[in-house]
Amino acid sequence: MEKEVNLYITPKSQDTDNIKDYLESAGVDFNVYDVHADFRVHKRMLEATRGACSAPVIEIGNQIVCGFDRERLEDTLAYELH
């Protein structure tokens, strides 16, 4: 079973744009959640990261990538999705 990829974002963020572009070019399906638009989404992101990260955050299965860390994102996607 393929794991969900969730992207917690803030609007108008260059890192968010970079992550979206990367995931789309890699053919990865992902869900987008705006932490500014919904308090429950913000709370869910904080719980997933244990408060250690601010948006954008990528959640892949139970793995978290904070910000646009291309190398970590590639490694995590390879491990979790393949």
PLM region descriptions:
Residues 17, 43, 74-75:
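Alpha-helical elements of the RecA-like P-loop NTPase motor core of helicases
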Residues 30-32, 64:
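Conserved beta-strand scaffold positions in the cores of enzyme catalytic domains, especially
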Residues 34-51:
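Thioredoxin-like thiol-disulfide oxidoreductase module
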Residues 56-65:
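A short, hydrophobic beta-strand/beta-hairpin element that forms part of a small beta-sheet core
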Residues 70:
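ATP/adenylate-binding site constellation spanning eukaryotic-like Ser/Thr protein kinases
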